[in-house]
From Swiss-Prot:
It is found in: Host cytoplasm. A zinc finger (C4-type) spans 55-69. Pfam families: Pns11_12 (PF17464). Its main location: host cell. Keywords: Host cytoplasm, Metal-binding, RNA-binding, Zinc, Zinc-finger. InterPro entries: Pns11/12. It comes from Rice dwarf virus (isolate Fujian). This is RNA-binding protein. GO terms for cellular component: host cell cytoplasm. Residues 168-180 have a biased composition (Low complexity). Residues 114-189 are annotated as: Disordered. GO terms for molecular function: RNA binding; zinc ion binding.
Length: 189
């Protein structure tokens, strides 16, 4: 081996980036609740590529799912960053022309999602199952008229629609004829 050390990677070559988290009331309240000192700025590392998505917490190298880090908030935000960055960079490299999508300089993470997984039943979002925006989208789809060729009044009906109507009318007549036959039998007796 030669006596020279390898050159350090530049920020653009590195697989690890740093992201600053905004300190809002929710973050401060969470740190106070966990009896931890709030750092001056919440800088959290994240992985730029899903291929390298190991956990970035102070303990030894392991996957995100196997994390045993005691600093819950920093570990959680690092993991969340891993997942977000993996989506942005891995899929973005394939689709986006520039090759890389730059992360936002500041991001606010919803720590309630993590805390409700520890203490379920605290979040109304978790209880609802779907967000309001998702529900509105479903409602819009239900209300919007179909835009097919056959949706106009007086237009031709498709063969499947005709068959469905024929089947339903046949089944109704069968039921009515059965009930008529039963009433006739009872009258004869």
């Amino acid at each position: 081996m030669s006596g020279t050390l390898p050159l350090a990677m530049t920020a653009s070559e590195s697989f690890v980036g740093m992201q600053v988290l905004a300190q809002d009331k929710e973050v401060k309240a969470t740190f106070i609740a966990l009896d931890r000192k709030l750092p001056a700025n919440l800088k959290v590392p994240y992985m730029k590529n899903a291929k390298y998505r190991t956990c970035i917490c102070p303990s030894s190298n392991h996957l995100v799912d196997d994390c045993v880090c005691e600093d819950v908030i920093i570990a959680y935000t690092a993991h969340r960053n891993n997942a977000v960055a993996a989506l942005l960079y891995s899929d973005g490299n394939v689709i986006h022309r520039s090759g890389t999508l730059k992360p936002k300089s500041q991001n606010r993470f919803d720590l309630r999602g993590f805390l409700t997984s520890v203490n379920p039943g605290e979040s109304s979002k978790a209880e609802a199952g779907t967000s309001k925006s998702t529900q509105k989208a479903y409602d819009r789809k239900d209300k919007s008229p179909s835009k097919g060729k056959n949706s106009k009044k007086g237009g031709k009906k498709s063969s499947s629609e005709r068959k469905r109507k024929e089947y339903s009318s046949n089944s109704e007549t069968d039921l009515s004829s059965d009930s008529d036959a039963n009433t006739r039998k009872s009258k004869r007796k």
